[in-house]
Every structure is written in C-alpha cells, then in structure tokens.
Amino acid sequence: MNDSVEIALQCGADGVHVGQSDIKGRDIRAIIGPDKILGISAGTVEQAVAAEQAGADYIGVGAVFPTSTKKDAKPMETELLRRISNSVSIPVVAIGGINAGNILKLSGSGVDGVAVVSAIFGAEDPGKAAAELRELSAQMVAAHE
C-alpha cells in the first residue's frame, strides 16, 4: 500500500511504502508493528541510512529513468544509485521509467529489484510484460552478485 498507513492497516495489507514527506519511519514502524513490511523512499545516501535506522525493510529509490507517472521526478544518476545501495544492508528497489528496454542498464548498480508501473499496466499483454521484466530483473541482479 503506497503512502496510507491507515488504509494499509484497515485492508490487511502486508505493508506500506512511504515517501520522505510522509510521517517518520520510526513512527510508522510503531504504528504498523514489527510484522508488516515497511518501505521508505530515499533520494540520498543520508535518507537511505536514516530509513534503515528507522526500521525500513527496504528502500525505494528513483526515479531512475524519465517516467510518466511522476512528471516532476528528475532521473537519478547511476552512481548515486550505487552509493545508496552500498550504504545500507537492506534491499534497495529502483523505480521510475523502468521497462524491458532499459532495465539491464541498472546492472552493476547494486539494486536488489525493481518496481514497475507503466511498462506493465500500459502493455498490450500485461502478463507477458510482467514475465519478461521478471526475467530481465533476475539477469540484472545476477550481474552484480
């Protein structure tokens, strides 16, 4: 569930993902408890480290490419993505403009996975697009293991 702790709890979601402008990670962890998944967005090494210290289970980082879902998001440089990945011990998930044509550009960045919206929901065959992205994501992660 994105950004709404209350709705996540009410609907029995497995967890919640929040941005930097939402309530603090420690406060969210106290509300949702230790068994729910907590993801926190980070755009800097400092934010990523703070998110991990606040009890995040994973860090969302991006936009890594130009994206249609967040027009104001400036794409992140791969080197910053690598520094963020190296600064925390929890998984880092890249988001923003990721599709089958660019996902492998993230190889070697240290990210543990990707979050994708438009490349699946905008596809003619969403199931096929998701399967292709899953395979490419595995290749991307394997490239830096």
Task: Pin down the residues of each PLM region.
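Alpha-helix-loop-beta-strand connector modules within alpha/beta enzyme cores
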Residues: 1, 20-43, 72-100, 133-144
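Short beta-strand segments at enzyme active-site cores
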Residues: 1-2, 59-61, 94, 116
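Conserved SAM-binding loop
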Residues: 1, 17, 40, 113, ...
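Amphipathic, non-transmembrane alpha-helical secondary structure
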Residues: 5-10, 25-26, 45-53, 78, ...
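Structural loop-to-beta junction motif characteristic of Rossmann-like glycosyltransferase folds
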Residues: 13-15, 90, 111
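Glycine-rich phosphate-binding active-site loops on the catalytic face of alpha/beta enzymes
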Residues: 20-30, 60-72, 100-136
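Glycine/Thr-rich beta-alpha phosphate-binding loop at enzyme active sites
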Residues: 10-18, 37, 41-86
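Small-residue (primarily alanine) positions within well-ordered alpha-helices
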Residues: 48-51, 56, 94, 111, ...
